[in-house]
């Protein structure tokens, strides 16, 4: 055999072999695999905001890529109230708690566009912080979005920002009582009707509604028309109560045949006819129809489709009592007339 030597031993008659050296097998190393750890990326938490108030829906949206003013919000505050305080040309924002120092800190806001004012107040009674943003001395519409700790605010002319614009006028007011009869004053009835309509509009943000008055004040006739012209209203609606003899009765609606059209081409006559259908249905009074009145200031100077509706006669005892009891019903009828008009005749914006 290869690598073996044979030796004969004469005494023992024994063969002895030189055995080859033992070859050690290579060691096998066993490695225990560590369990694989899977790392899942944590998605950033998205803050949810609760927004209430009467600010209308805007056709132009505010976002972190489209804004005029960016405001850093206080940490942990996620509920806000928004309102267009157009009489003072301001956007109003409020939240619970005292954050005056936070909002007054200039480093917490950044303006891409110039603005007329930024004011912060604390209401100790309601325990809320009030923020007033004044974009301009002229009327402005606003859009606001809340995203990841910031409020983004966009503004522009009302007709740029809002799709459906109405001016609602409560006739008379202040020192001008209007017609009187049966212990009632026209200015009180018209205001009650308009405020009832406002309750409906406040719940539907598809409409930007400007009111000539919401308290017992007297805006001039010029101011009423000018409001509609300044905001670029689609429609103007003035609420009134008639007066004559004790036997006069019925509902009628006035229009100006020489007046302006709405932005979508609707005439004052068509607008008046729409409103009158709701007025007469709500009152149930005698239908006196549509009346052409070219001399009325608010119908002559308003540069859009405009109408003035007379619900009934304050001098008629039966109608006066009915009107006093049904202002909420009439207000809802005015709301429904506006909704119907915009649905059947959308604005061109």
PLM features: what roles do these ranges have?
Residues 1-166:
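Short linear recognition/processing motifs and adjacent strand/loop elements at protein termini
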Residues 150-227, 231, 257:
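Active-site histidine-acidic residue metal-binding/catalytic motifs
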Residues 172-175, 214-219, 241-247, 258-262, ...:
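Solvent-exposed loop/turn segments at secondary-structure junctions
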Residues 176-184, 244-274:
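A short, glycine/acidic-enriched catalytic loop
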Residues 191-194, 198, 222-225, 251, ...:
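Extracytoplasmic/secreted envelope proteins and their assembly/folding machinery
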Residues 195-206, 229-233, 276-284, 328, ...:
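Sec-exported extracytoplasmic/periplasmic mature domains
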Residues 238-241, 254, 289-349:
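Active-site-adjacent mobile loop/cap segments within catalytic or ligand-binding domains
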Residues 266-292:
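Active-site-adjacent substrate-binding region
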